[in-house]
């Protein structure tokens, strides 16, 4: 699972949500 290094946990989540899709 690859996610961008974002400073905000919310953005991370979002990234995880997109990756997951």
Curated annotation (Swiss-Prot):
GO terms for molecular function: toxin activity. It is found in: Secreted. Keywords: Neurotoxin, Secreted, Toxin. Coiled coil: none annotated. One of its GO terms (cellular component) is extracellular region. Expressed by the venom gland. Belongs to the scolopendra toxin 8 family. This is Scolopendra 7997.01 Da toxin.
């Amino acid at each position: 699972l690859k996610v961008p290094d974002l400073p905000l946990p919310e953005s991370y989540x979002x990234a995880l949500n997109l990756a997951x899709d």
